[in-house]
C-alpha cells in the first residue's frame, strides 16, 4: 500500500535495494530516520556521499582504498612474497580479523559463474596473472569461498598460475562447504589458513 508520499516511497525503495533488506525493514529504517529528525538523515547522507566520493579500488590488488593503493599494499612490513586471492573486499576484512596472515591480497571482484554470465573476463584474473609474472611472489594462496563457484574459480586460478614457478595452496577445510569467508569466526579462519594445502 502506498503512503501517497513520493519522497517517502522513493526512500523506502532505495533502502530495500540493499542486500538482506526487504520492504518492511526498509520502511522501519526510513521511519527511524524521520523519527530521529533531520540530523540522523543528514549524517547518513553525508556518509554515503563520502563513501561514493572517497572509496575506490586499489590500483594493485582491487581491495577498497582511499588513495591509489590500499593500506595493505602500502605496508612495507607485510610479506610481499605471499598473495592471497579472495573473491570480495569483505573477505580481506575477514582474513585480517583472523590475524594469521601478513602477506598481500588480490581481490577478484567475484567468482566464476557461467550460469550468471560471469566468466574470466569479468574478474580481475588478468591483473592477478600480471602480478604473478612480475616476479617476487613465492606463494599464491587461493582463498575463494568453499562453494561450487568458488571451487571452480580456484581450479581456474590453479590452471592459470601452474606454468609459473610459485607454490600454489588452498585454504584448508575446516571451512564448511557452501560457507562464505565473511561469516566465519576468526578461529575457524585462522585454522583454515594455518592448514592450507598445496594444490599441485
Curated annotation (Swiss-Prot):
**Residues in Toprim domain copies:** 81-176
Zinc-finger as UniProt keyword: yes
List the SMART domains hit by this protein, alphabetically.
TOPRIM (SM00493)
Residue spans annotated as Zn fingers (C4-type) read 58-73
- Biological processes annotated in GO: DNA recombination; DNA repair
Going by the UniProt record, its keywords in alphabetical order are: DNA damage, DNA recombination, DNA repair, Metal-binding, Zinc, Zinc-finger
Kindly indicate whether the keyword DNA damage belongs to this entry: yes
The record's PROSITE patterns line, in alphabetical order, gives: RECR (PS01300), TOPRIM (PS50880)
The molecular function terms of the Gene Ontology recorded here are:
DNA binding; zinc ion binding
Quote any Pfam family the record assigns: Toprim_4
Q: Could you tell me which InterPro entries the record lists for this protein? A: DNA_Rcmb_RecR, Rcmb_RecR, Rcmb_RecR_Znf, TOPRIM_dom, TOPRIM_RecR
What does this chain do? May play a role in DNA repair. It seems to be involved in an RecBC-independent recombinational process of DNA repair. It may act with RecF and RecO.
Q: Which family does it belong to?
A: Belongs to the RecR family.
Protein name (record): Recombination protein RecR
Q: Which organism is it from?
A: Magnetococcus marinus (strain ATCC BAA-1437 / JCM 17883 / MC-1)
Highest classification ranks of the organism: Bacteria, Pseudomonadati, Pseudomonadota, Alphaproteobacteria, Magnetococcales
